[in-house]
Design a protein with these regions (language model features):
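C-terminal recognition in membrane/secretory proteostasis and scaffolding
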Residues: 1-175
Length: 175
């Protein structure tokens, strides 16, 4: 159990050493392996669908997911230390719903998000907060691949958000 003490015996240079360790809870992982009893967090803005990366998401690419899932996301799973700096979770643009606000971006998907409206994206909460206020009259979302920055007109994206809710989408975000 977390907090319990564990006695260890170690051999070093032919000599026995006695050590004591306290069991700790493992640190929070950048990428959850699985989520139990909880739906994954998401944010939809103007037709852009953002999620926090999980192993379950990658496994949804099928039996051969380790070769079929997007390479950038697989790299993040296999080398999380390359993506950890300043992040609590890895947020990515999972897909683009074709809407008047997302014209030209419909082929952009499965890209890691680094910033939104000039704010560093550290988890879903930070993305949601950053997208509340556009900068210089536009929403800007920086991703780690071409086109590098996605621009959304705030009025058009708000109109799309209202339309999605009217068509039965239960919510634009879930934490």
């Amino acid at each position: 159990q977390v907090g319990d003490k564990l006695s260890l015996v170690n051999m070093r240079d032919g000599k026995e050493q006695k050590l004591e360790a306290v069991l700790r809870r493992p640190p929070e992982s950048l990428i959850h392996s699985h989520m139990y009893d909880k739906s994954p967090p998401y944010q939809i803005k103007g037709g852009l669908v953002f999620q926090e990366l999980t192993r379950s998401y990658l496994e949804a690419f099928g039996k051969e997911w380790q070769s079929r899932a997007p390479l950038d996301l697989l790299d993040a799973l296999n080398n999380p230390e390359d993506y950890e700096e300043g992040r609590k979770r890895l947020v990515f643009l999972s897909r683009v719903i074709r809407t008047p606000a997302t014209i030209g971006y419909d082929q952009v998907n499965n890209k890691i998000v680094t910033e939104a409206n000039g704010e560093k994206v550290t988890d879903m909460e930070s993305l949601i907060s950053a997208l509340k206020e556009p900068r210089d009259g536009l929403h800007s979302i920086r991703i780690d691949d071409v086109p590098y920055v996605i621009y959304l007109d705030p009025e058009a994206s708000d109109q799309v958000d209202r339309a999605l809710l009217q068509r039965g989408l239960p919510a634009l975000e879930r934490l």
